[in-house]
């Protein structure tokens, strides 16, 4: 799990470049105390308790034993509590079941108890890094819970869900007064202004709050952003445009109009340019870094989902997410107005399809040979070994994913595909210090493993191992057995035995292959012989139990799935459950 909660708590939010668009748009407001107002929520559920800091992860950091023990305490919350952690705007989760799990009253009470315990045992001087105290991190969890779970006092509905149903308008003046002055909307702005743990309350929201106060005759004494409890200095960064192409905006430009004219994703354009404050009205003369171009664009419709976009364009769900950086891992903001990034997506790989180097198994030492990983370093989990060059992530270099790609002339999407322990949207924080990453995968690296042994050339005719009809040509070099419809694909009903005399590889082989019954993610081994299409309600654990495999096997065969199964696992996608 690699200390999941440690990575998601505040530090990652502020120092992992690009994880949330609002981080780069906003600023870390400086410190003003806020009283925690408990949201009205009567849901009560029993959960396996969650540790924000797994036992032992804080040893050796100079904390008192009392403080360290307090931080290891667990809370009575669902593990999905991590999904509400953000330095940006907190909106609807678009999932009633998930909202109920996160917003159980037992969770809030447990967080409050932990906050009091850490306050007593650690105070506000014990810091994870200079300027970020442990107490402030627990406070951030509490604040995020409050803003995720507050409800309408009359109806009991989650206020974020209520706000999400407001009419989609382009001007404040077009918002219905009943919505504008509703308890939920006014309370939302009040909580954002008072939040000392987030930079979401920016100049735009301040103007919005003033407009609401004036329209609704509210008495508000302070519209200024609350000073942050975080006093850490952001590290100096250099701005680099990955594509090398910039664009100066003209009057009337929008994210969509630029995306269509330049052949890029509006989502990625918004994500990578923090100087875009409003995608519908970009300030004239703004200098923008253009994303890598893509040959196929798609305009999102109001009833679209990432699954429907994928089906319409013959690509996978994960492709939609990976090629359009502003989209969240579960695609919850595809048509969201918070913030509205536009509607134009890349439906093909940004930068084009990579052809790679020629794969060779000769003994020559030219640049097309497979290069062994550097001696004495650990290869990142799942990284291809069919690789012509490696990058070791040394702490002294201070590289992020963009700088690694630039210095090694590799497209970001290819870098992530060749190293599946990295996620396109969280790449910087996924990098492990000291690990080696492939930065030059060879041609056909997805299909051939450098650990396999070459076998002798097969020259004899292919003989099928099952009954066939009469009259089939004796020169047939491939057979396919008709299969019945099933959500599980295995080598028995979908066996193809084939050999090609024209393939330019150094060895020919007789093989049994399986066609996945649905979209798959990168990293699945070529020798997978059985797939399972995840159904609604499935988890990694249920799939493992159903197919009598271990968690280690499932994660090894499906490296795009995170170790805790919270990312990379979606319904209607195929996962490998057996290999030859």
Swiss-Prot record:
Chief site of localization: secreted
Subcellular location: Secreted
Entry GO CC: extracellular region
Domain of life according to the entry: Eukaryota
Keyword Transport annotated: no
Transmembrane segments: none
Glycan-linked positions: 43, 55, 95, 146, 168, 217, 224, 231, 278, 303, 330, 353, 400, 423, 451, 508
Range of residues in the leader sequence: 1-30
Region entry Disordered, spans: 498-518
Outcome of gene disruption: Leads to enhanced fungal virulence, with faster decaying on infected fruits.
Note: In plants, chitin acts as a microbe-associated molecular pattern (MAMP) that is recognized by lysin motif (LysM)-containing plant cell surface-localized pattern recognition receptors (PRRs) that activate a plethora of downstream immune responses.
Similarity remark: Belongs to the secreted LysM effector family.
Function per UniProt: Secreted LysM effector that might have a role in sequestration of chitin oligosaccharides (breakdown products of fungal cell walls that are released during invasion and act as triggers of host immunity) to dampen host defense.
Domain remark in the UniProt entry: The LysM (lysin motif) domains are small globular domains involved in binding chitin in eukaryotes. LysM7 contains 4 LysM domains.
Name used for this protein in its record: Secreted LysM effector LysM7
Organism: Penicillium expansum (Blue mold rot fungus)
Gene: LysM7
């Amino acid at each position: 799990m690699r200390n999941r909660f440690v990575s998601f708590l505040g530090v990652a939010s502020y120092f992992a470049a690009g994880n949330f668009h609002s981080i780069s748009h906003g600023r870390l407001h400086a410190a003003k105390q806020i009283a925690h107002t408990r949201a009205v929520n009567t849901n009560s559920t029993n959960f396996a308790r969650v540790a924000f800091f797994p036992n032992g992860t804080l040893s050796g950091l100079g904390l008192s034993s009392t403080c360290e023990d307090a931080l290891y305490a667990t809370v009575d919350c669902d593990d999905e509590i991590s999904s509400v952690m953000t330095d940006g705007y907190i909106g609807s989760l678009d999932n009633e079941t998930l909202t109920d799990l996160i917003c159980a009253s037992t969770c809030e009470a447990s967080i409050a108890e932990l906050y009091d315990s850490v306050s007593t045992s650690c105070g506000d001087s014990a810091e994870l890094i200079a300027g970020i105290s442990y107490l402030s991190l627990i406070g951030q969890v509490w604040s995020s819970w409050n803003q995720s779970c507050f409800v309408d006092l009359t109806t009991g509905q989650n206020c974020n869900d209520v706000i999400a149903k407001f009419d989609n308008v382009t001007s404040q003046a077009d918002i219905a007064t009943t919505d504008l002055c509703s308890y939920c909307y006014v309370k939302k702005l009040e909580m954002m202004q008072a939040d000392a743990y987030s930079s979401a309350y920016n100049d735009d929201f301040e103007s919005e709050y003033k407009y609401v106060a004036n329209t609704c005759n509210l008495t508000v004494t302070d519209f200024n952003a609350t000073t942050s409890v975080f006093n850490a200095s952001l590290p100096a960064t250099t701005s680099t445009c990955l594509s090398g192409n910039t664009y100066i905006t003209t009057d009337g430009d929008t994210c969509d109009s630029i995306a269509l004219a330049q052949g890029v994703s509006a989502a990625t354009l918004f994500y990578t340019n923090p100087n875009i404050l409003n995608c519908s009205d970009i300030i004239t003369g703004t200098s923008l870094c253009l994303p890598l171009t893509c040959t196929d664009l798609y305009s999102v419709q109001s009833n679209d989902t990432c699954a429907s976009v994928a089906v319409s364009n013959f690509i996978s769900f994960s492709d939609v997410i990976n090629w359009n950086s502003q989209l969240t891992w579960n695609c919850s903001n595809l048509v969201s107005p918070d913030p509205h990034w536009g509607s134009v997506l890349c439906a093909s790989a940004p930068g084009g399809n990579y052809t790679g180097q020629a794969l060779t198994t000769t003994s020559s030492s030219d640049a097309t040979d497979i290069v062994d990983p550097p001696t004495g370093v650990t290869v990142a989990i799942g990284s291809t070994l069919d690789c012509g060059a490696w990058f070791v992530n040394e702490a002294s270099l201070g590289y992020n994913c963009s700088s690694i790609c630039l210095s090694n002339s590799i497209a970001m999407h290819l870098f992530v595909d060749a190293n599946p322990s990295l996620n396109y949207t969280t790449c910087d924080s996924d990098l492990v210090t000291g690990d080696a990453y492939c930065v030059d995968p060879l041609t056909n690296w997805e299909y051939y493993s450098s650990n396999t042994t070459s076998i002798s050339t097969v020259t004899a005719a292919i003989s099928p191992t099952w009954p066939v009809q009469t009259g089939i040509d004796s020169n047939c070099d491939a057979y396919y057995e008709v299969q019945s419809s099933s959500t599980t694909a295995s080598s028995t009903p979908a066996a193809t035995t084939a050999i090609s005399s024209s393939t330019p590889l150094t060895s020919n082989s007789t093989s049994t292959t399986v066609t996945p019954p649905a979209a798959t993610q990168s990293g699945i081994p070529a020798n997978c012989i059985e797939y399972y299409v995840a159904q609604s309600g499935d988890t990694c654990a249920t799939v493992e139990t159903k197919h009598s495999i271990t968690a280690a096997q499932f994660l090894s065969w499906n490296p795009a799935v995170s170790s805790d199964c919270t990312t990379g696992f979606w319904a209607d996608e195929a996962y490998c459950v057996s290999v030859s």
